[in-house]
Amino acid sequence: MRTIRIGSGAGYSGDRIEPAVELAEKGDIQYLVFECLGERTVALAQQARMKDPDAGFDPLLEERMRAVLRLCAAKGIKIVTNMGAANPVAAARKTAEIAKSLGLSSLKIAAVIGDDVLDDCKDGDLRIMEFDGSIKQLGNRLLSANAYLGAAPMAEALSGGADIVITGRASDPALFLAPMIHAFGWAMDDWNLLGQGTVAGHLLECAGQITGGYFADPGYKDVADLARLGFPIGEVGEDGSLVITKVAGSGGAVTAQTCKEQLLYEVHDPKQYIQPDVVADFSQVKIEEIARDRVRVSGGRGTKRTDTLKVSVGYVDSYIGEGQISYAGPGALARGRLALEIVRERLKLTGVASSELRFELIGVDALHGAEVSAHANEPYEVRVRVAGRTENLREAVRIGNEVETLYTNGPAAGGGAFKSARDVVAVASVLLPRELARPQVRFVEA
């Protein structure tokens, strides 16, 4: 039975680069996938593209490509990535430019476009899933609308001879499913194979999470050599059989526990994990360790895909103003609390208009609140943080300014003040009839 090995080279935009190089050097892989596109990332990329039509792709695209292109070209490893973000064509052109500069003139690069459905959405009455409202009501605050594409156009690009496939918004598992469809000729209505392939993609998509990164918890779940964490490899058979592993000798661990945690990551209903290509069913998945750092995963199934695609909508929601300052030594906690009370009163006295305010001591009550931390030992040092949501930038700036004035206006011995004000790019979701997303493949020669 034919088997392919797919390496996961990144789990988010800013992920480490050397584990991907290790996969290309030592992983005996045929495909290297970089999953770099978070939910808000494409909206932020769209903002960048509005300022510069040649921008809008992943900021680390050049660094990643320069690190792996020679290796991948020499070994025949194909690259699949969503680093195209809001501008896959520009990303493909940039990659061709990089390849040429490295003396790799024969690489074939494909850009998958069609996820940008802003024009199809902005004047419609599509209902927002997270709150009561429609996309039309966002008005000029709307920045982007990108449909989650499936594996088919990426598989088409691979079948067309692409060495590198660059897409924008696509479902994360689809990046891994595409090589399986291409390599094995899976039918796009073989729901059980697509379901099992989606299990594989879901397990691999976050890179170092499944090899122990997100799993590690000292004293409870110890993982060795996290500074050299190896990224995962999926060995996939044409029948959908799957083994998760990593490069021998790399840091981290692949165990039944790490795989089970990742299987449940971001899953609301294990029986209906809705993807563009299939509704995957994880409920009968079986996970078993077969050797050190080798875990067999079976039992993924699927049913017919939906008639709609999820669309990630980016919009300017509000503004956030923030200020921080530190206190240390005897009485630090009391001084920190006094600082919060001073700022709270100052914001009232000066009439700062906000819709939401947070007053917290980092390391004391910032994460779980004052009730949970009430009985903890008093810390030697604290960091005051005040943040507020406002309707305009001017009011947001005033919040940080008030924290900064604690330097000279008390309490005693504050230091390391920081302030910022920024717009908040939020994301929401709508469902779009599938036929309104029209993916296309465009080839670029290096």
Predicted features, each with a name:
Residues 1-22:
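N-terminal amphipathic/basic leader segments beginning at the initiator methionine
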